[in-house]
Amino acid sequence: MLQPKRTKFRKMHKGRNRGLAQGTDVSFGTFGLKAVGRGRLTARQIEAARRAMTRAVKRQGKIWIRVFPDKPITEKPLEVRMGKGKGNVEYWVALIQPGKVLYEMDGVPEEVAREAFKLAAAKLPIKTTFVTKTVM
């Protein structure tokens, strides 16, 4: 599972997920899976989509993960009264804005890449689209 090795602070404010995305172009591979919607991906969702893609391409080609879960999400235990401080870190998420390239792939035919990204998109809670590298 993806998570930071060490952080400056253990817990983080909730914050807001506004603004425009960084990393909107396919830069490493030939094909990419781009986010259309806004939301957050947990480390488990990122890993589940990666496994689905890897199985679909039968371990040929190369896959790049362009998102990293660096925001800790805390939860309080069940049946605990409010107050008494912030809860414990339960999982890590990556905040996603529209236009962000989530995954990239190279070394496979386009039909195989499309099918792999379709399987991966089914594991993710946000809308995505298939993109190819634009050659200038």
UniProtKB/Swiss-Prot annotation:
GO molecular function ontology, one term from the record: structural constituent of ribosome
Gene3D superfamilies in alphabetical order: Ribosomal protein L10e/L16
GO biological process: translation
InterPro entries: Ribosomal_uL16, Ribosomal_uL16_bact-type, Ribosomal_uL16_CS, Ribosomal_uL16_dom, Ribosomal_uL16_sf
Assigned keywords, A-Z: Ribonucleoprotein, Ribosomal protein, RNA-binding, rRNA-binding, tRNA-binding
PROSITE patterns on file: RIBOSOMAL_L16_1, RIBOSOMAL_L16_2
Any GO CC annotation of this UniProt entry: cytosolic large ribosomal subunit
Coiled-coil positions: none
Entry-linked Pfam families: Ribosomal_L16
Function of the protein: Binds 23S rRNA and is also seen to make contacts with the A and possibly P site tRNAs.
Subunit record text: Part of the 50S ribosomal subunit.
Similarity comment: Belongs to the universal ribosomal protein uL16 family.
Protein name according to UniProt: Large ribosomal subunit protein uL16
